[in-house]
Amino acid sequence: MTPAVFLVILCFGVASGAPARDPNLDAEWQDWKTKYAKSYSPVEEELKRAVWEENLKMIQLHNKENGLGKNGFTMEMNAFADTTGEEFRKSLSDILIPAAVTNPSAQKQVSIGLPNFKDWRKEGYVTPVRNQGKCGSCWAFAAVGAIEGQMFSKTGNLTPLSVQNLLDCSKSEGNNGCRWGTAHQAFNYVLKNKGLEAEATYPYEGKDGPCRYHSENASANITGFVNLPPNELYLWVAVASIGPVSAAIDASHDSFRFYSGGVYHEPNCSSYVVNHAVLVVGYGFEGNETDGNNYWLIKNSWGEEWGINGFMKIAKDRNNHCGIASQASFPDIF
């Protein structure tokens, strides 16, 4: 197995604001606050309202251009709408990693035996979308999702596993709770610990705590894990044949945080910098196969109200778009 370079990921939740106000938007503002249970001090209200309006204008412009055929995806207001782009990006780390090297001829050759579509949700491998909240626990959600899928493959039972167990107990492997971590370090913890609890016995709190693992409650274990080389070809083969795979991407753009549908392609996305962990649960294409509108199907951890019920279609076979293949891994269970 060729080792890949694996780097710490800083994940992110929700942040704070800036200024402006259009009285015609008062009702929409109140509805948005109610929907996302937002409340502010009088001073903060003015700042948040201004940021919210700026984000609304940006999203409306994007969707108008999308209607004219300029973009391939839509955006919408969501829980991040009172947050500036700068605030959002401050929660991320800028870590350089080697670019993925793609060999088109090899990819075409290997792809002959692979299905055109894969969606592990339809085969029972994927648990419902959860919400990490303000804790930077994306890495733990991505790791847990991959283990859940492999446990289902082995046992036929799909059990939501404990993200909190990883947050509290995998610091010895280099993870740092709500601050940062990687899926492969989480896998290493489970391997050494010889077990991971279920969500039912070790529920998510969204904050760091002392390790409270009880071996008698272990619901999953792994026998090893694989770090994939940073190349979409390897990711393609793994997702087609193994199951859901943990990955990391550049999620620092406004277009990502407000994504709502379509195949996401952000021209400014980096293939060298990753800052948010996700679970790749499938792939496919929109339109005709020859259109080249291929996508990876990823599961996020921002709740079902983000994206396509918590999922995203992100461009596939586009030079490792957003670094999707740069830090991919999956557990072994024999």
Swiss-Prot record:
Keywords recorded for this protein, A-Z: Disulfide bond, Glycoprotein, Hydrolase, Lysosome, Protease, Signal, Thiol protease, Zymogen
Signal sequence, start to end: 1-17
Enzyme Commission code: 3.4.22.-
Cellular compartments annotated: Lysosome
Active site: 138, 276, 300
Residues listed as glycosylation sites in the UniProt record: 217, 221, 268, 288
Any one Gene Ontology molecular-function term assigned to this protein's record: cysteine-type endopeptidase activity
SMART domains: Inhibitor_I29, Pept_C1
Recorded superkingdom: Eukaryota
Tissue specificity as recorded in UniProt: Expressed specifically in placenta.
Stored InterPro entries: Papain-like_cys_pep_sf, Pept_asp_AS, Pept_cys_AS, Pept_his_AS, Peptidase_C1A, Peptidase_C1A_C, Peptidase_C1A_papain-like, Prot_inhib_I29
One GO term (biological process): proteolysis involved in protein catabolic process
Record's GO cellular component terms: extracellular space; lysosome; perinuclear region of cytoplasm
Family to which the UniProt record says this protein belongs: Belongs to the peptidase C1 family.
Record protein name field: Cathepsin J
Origin organism lineage: Eukaryota, Metazoa, Chordata, Craniata, Vertebrata
